[in-house]
């Protein structure tokens, strides 16, 4: 019988071999990941005499409506083919969610290969990004002499602080985002470099930071990729776009990834030759329902009983009675019924109460829907970390 436990350093070679078997990452990226990011204390494995399956929980801090919470990305879920069909993924994910609850985490994040696989565990798509497909011939050259661009060749504390300053300025417009510190930008820089990307920093004539861009000029043949683009004024955006356009002898087009509050289509004059798509990026799942409902109901005059269906975490599979800001587990008949995935999407502001109800995700009378609607609001989120 397989044992579910945390990895030891002695397991590293087997875990890396399974990663390389399961994923198509370049060797340079795998070296970076296991040298710089990997922590056996965050790696759950299923093992008999040999490794069968693996799952990693990489730690982050998520800020939800000014509430800073510890969380973790579930990544690297992998099972050797001869052991698939033995419910090892289920065992690992169930254990990962139990660990998340015991560690006081309120939300679990998951980077999916196939979203359909993970919805059965209560995860739902909650974070999306805009993807702009732009021909370089449609980018106007706007060289601005008041902007100085610097290609970062080595990360320093000073540079990391400037990037954090820009990120936090943009985050003022987001309701949900992952918090970043110096360590994040050091490891982010190394991740970008092993994938042949560059970070460009823009400063004005007063030497103040006004934006940065993460650009991969060789992501695909004849196509570049802008993974991240932040600007604090239009002159920085002009300079970044001119830099991208200067690659016209190398590239035909570029994919530009942007947050939900992007003004890029406006910048391009709503050019109908530019295609824009909304790409689901990251899944999430509530780990602690009581905590979430207490945050949502704080200072509200409300009387509502909500039944949450959660087939994995029994402490969430309850009727929660909300009354005037307090939340308690109750034997009351529920006014509202929904599953953990629907509650997660409502909490994250991904869907509205009316949309969820119309799609049959919520059971409730109209009078109770009106009360429920007071708890949730649309949120602008930004999550763009891969591992």
Per-range role (PLM):
Residues 2, 8-9, 151-387:
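Intrinsically disordered, low-complexity, positively biased terminal segments
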Residues 50-60, 73, 78, 201, ...:
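Conserved beta-strand in the GNAT
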Residues 1-59, 66-73, 140-183, 220-224:
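Short amphipathic alpha-helix that is part of the acyltransferase structural core
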Residues 79, 85-98, 234-245:
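Conserved acetyl-CoA-binding loop-helix of GNAT-fold acetyltransferases
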Residues 60-62, 82, 115:
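Short coil/turn motifs at secondary-structure junctions
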Residues 102-106, 112-130, 261-276:
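Conserved active-site alpha-helix within GNAT-family acetyltransferase domains
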Residues 125-143:
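Flexible glycine-/small-residue-enriched beta->alpha junction loops
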